[in-house]
Every structure is written in C-alpha cells, then in structure tokens.
A protein has these predicted regions:
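Extracytoplasmic
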Residues: 15-49, 70
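Helical-face signature of the major facilitator-like transporter fold
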Residues: 23-28, 60, 94, 102-114
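Small-residue-rich segments within alpha-helical transmembrane domains of MFS-like 12-TM solute carriers
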Residues: 28, 32, 98, 114-122
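Residue-level signature of mid-helix packing/kink "hotspots" within the transmembrane helices
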Residues: 32, 60-68, 118
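Helix-to-coil boundary motifs at intracellular loop junctions of multi-pass secondary transporters
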Residues: 44-45, 76, 127-131
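Juxtamembrane helix-start elements in MFS-like secondary transporters
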Residues: 48-56
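Conserved MFS/SLC helix-loop-helix module at the cytosolic interface between two early adjacent transmembrane helices
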Residues: 65-104
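Cytoplasmic helix-loop-helix junction between adjacent transmembrane helices
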Residues: 109-141
C-alpha cells in the first residue's frame, strides 16, 4: 500500500531546496573565511593568534547554540520563514563583518552569521521531506 502525497511542482520544490542548500553552502564559506583573511584581520584589528582564534570561534558558538532551537522554531513558524530570516540575518552579519570598524563589530558580525546559517541544514531537510517526492529525499539530503 502506498501513500499518495501532494507535492508542489518539481521546479518550485527544487528551487526552494536550492535556497536552503545555498545557505548551507554559504555557511561553509564563512567557516573558513577568517583562515583565509588571517593576515588582513591581524593587521586591521591588531590581533594576535589567540584573539584571531576567538574572533573565528564566535561563529561556531552561535552555530552550535542554534542547532536545537532551529528545529523547534522550524516546527513552530515553518522552515520557509525561518530560512528567509536566516538569509536576511546572515547577509546583515556579513555586511557588518565586512565593514566592521572595530573588533567588537567584527565579532558581532561573525556571531550573527553563525547563528543564522545554522538554520540552513535543518530547514533544507524539513523542506525536502514536505516538498519532494519520497524517492528523491536521499538525493536532496
């Protein structure tokens, strides 16, 4: 016995999935950005290795802290809204980090980025379970 599911058109479903996957990919970029920019960050903010590591770690602190709340919030408000919010906040965090006049603002930007890209993976999987046919879930995951 098979259960029929009403899913949106494939192009729309994969487009929305791509949005979440794009945010997840952006998260990987932001994880390694301080390693690539270590010289520039050290010179611009006068950082030693410890301070640079702390600046980089702010991303991971907020990323980890948002993992469980992300699932709960996605169940309450829906993954699409949460994903859009994550994209907006990560964009604001990236702009703040790029234009930061001091270490405080750079750290706040990193913290916002980490917390907001944390929604990417959870929301993408949740959208895939609802929007894609069951046979295609393993491809989307």
């Amino acid at each position: 016995m098979s259960i029929l599911r009403n899913t949106p058109p494939a192009a729309l479903a994969w487009s929305v999935w791509g949005l979440g996957a794009g945010l997840f990919l952006l998260g990987f970029f932001h994880r390694v950005a301080p390693a690539v920019l270590h010289r520039e960050l050290s010179v611009d903010f006068g950082l030693n290795a410890t301070s640079l590591g702390s600046l980089s770690a702010l991303y991971f602190y907020s990323y980890v802290a948002m993992q469980i709340p992300t699932g709960l919030i996605a169940d309450r408000v829906g993954p699409r809204r949460l994903l859009i919010g994550g994209i907006i906040i990560s964009t604001l965090g990236a702009i703040l980090f790029a234009l930061a006049p001091s270490l405080f603002w750079a750290g706040l930007g990193r913290f916002l980025i980490g917390g907001s890209v944390a929604v990417g993976f959870v929301c993408t999987l949740k959208l895939a379970t609802h929007w894609l046919p069951t046979e295609q879930f393993s491809l989307a995951a």
